[in-house]
């Protein structure tokens, strides 16, 4: 039903990280996403600035990630860029994707478009 309304009203939907960045919780470089950056992302989404940005597709989660956003350093738009160790990030992303995939199996009879839009843990 939500998807139908989003499509019907040609609505853009944005997912904004307001949680942990730079690593898993408890890791040395792990930190909460900075509130001014979160606010800047929400503002850019609401005023239409984010629609003008160039996006790249996240290879694991399939999300369109902006390459730029007014008021936000580019590295804060990429979770991978915030981790010191690329391999550790990739392992954590794959593990999280596998958790999403496992949890989603309880939802049967979903359209292929929905199933195929989910994370890829290959």
What are these regions (language model features)?
Residues 1-122:
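Conserved NTP phosphate-binding and transfer environment spanning the P-loop NTPase/kinase superfamily
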